[in-house]
Amino acid sequence: MSERHLFTSESVSEGHPDKIADQISDSILDELLKNDPDARVACETTVTTGLVVVVGEISTTAYIDIQKVVRKTIKDIGYVGGEYGFDGENCAVIVAIDEQSPDIAQGVDDSLETREGHEDRLNQIGAGDQGLMFGYATNETEELMPLPIMLSHHLMQRIAKLRKEQVISYLRPDAKAEVTVEYDDNDHPVRVDTVVLSTQHDPDVTLEQIRQDVIEQVIKAVIPATLLDENTNFYINPTGRFVIGGPQGDAGLTGRKIIVDTYGGAARHGGGAFSGKDATKVDRSASYAARYIAKNIVAAKLAERVEVQIAYAIGVAEPVSVMVDTFGTGTVSEEKLTQAVRKIFDLRPAGIIEMLDLKRPIYKQTAAYGHFGRTDVELPWEKTDKVEALNDFFKN
């Protein structure tokens, strides 16, 4: 007898308050990296009705107009006009930026290994903080990602496209989706059990119209018909009305959608957010490296699913630990996999930066619709170019 179990993940649109904040922080980061690839950036944003506040620590040789970057980002999302209660042209923008603490900088610029006489240039940069980071991959989708989070992201991308192209003219920027997938006893997805989708809208449209348009033009356009059946539940704007949204409805803050950003709850999370941080911050760069490792392990068919943990001490280049968990799906031992990871992937911060070319302005595009499993943009940690090296390791 097969065992039925359900798993749910969610995503939010680029117009969600927390995602506005993420995009502003990463837009500032990208603009700095265009002019100074070695910029040290920790940029946090909060948004509310008519107001944006940008704070943080930035050390750079570049000058950028932060106000201009903020306003352009907001307008690009679609917040143009006073009826939204938040308008990129007229909102207030407060900026309070300090330099990176010299106490932190001395450990990042001059790692413990360098101070102890190690001459390898990739030892020079120490981790920007202590912490633990996870990466994950599974063979249940082509992207080697969990199905619930991928469907949730695709629903949000689809509704944004229909809004921006004016196919559905009453849509406003804020939206959320949640998808529940049924799995069989072999952990394979077999059907979609429930879809929840809430979208901000103009005041003069009926709930019936929204429901019809969302089901026909969004859900059925994204989710394969083979995964939908007569028992699939659709909850479309279940409160009945969603006119007030975006920062007018809820304050937004950088780094508050870390599960949306990663694996939708299917994997563990170390707690560190990504947006607004340059690559010396291992919260970001080591999470990308862990995904890169996990994806290559699954692509090499060394496991059906895998989770990788990396942990660091502040000011130290080498990770304090590396862990590989295949959940019993591995074709080789986890001990051997860990050895392979340590040999093939350089997990020192400078090694990760070089391996994934992370000094480029590539981050704003990750600040909505997920950092992993993306096929609409080219991200270096999504490459599977280490498959051959992994397979060669196990031939010896």
UniProtKB/Swiss-Prot annotation:
PROSITE patterns: ADOMET_SYNTHASE_1, ADOMET_SYNTHASE_2. Binds 2 divalent ions per subunit. Binds 1 potassium ion per subunit. It is an enzyme of class 2 (transferase). Its EC number is 2.5.1.6. Its main location: cytoplasm. The keyword Metal-binding applies. ATP binds at H16, D174, A175, K176, R241, F242, D250, R256, K257, A273, K277. Mg(2+) binds at D18. Pathway: Amino-acid biosynthesis; S-adenosyl-L-methionine biosynthesis; S-adenosyl-L-methionine from L-methionine: step 1/1. Residues 100-110 are annotated as: Flexible loop. One of its GO terms (biological process) is one-carbon metabolic process. It is found in: Cytoplasm. The keyword Amino-acid biosynthesis does not apply. Its cofactor is Mg(2+); K(+). Homotetramer; dimer of dimers. Belongs to the AdoMet synthase family. This is S-adenosylmethionine synthase. It comes from Pediococcus pentosaceus (strain ATCC 25745 / CCUG 21536 / LMG 10740 / 183-1w). The lineage of its organism: Bacteria, Bacillati, Bacillota, Bacilli, Lactobacillales. The gene is metK.
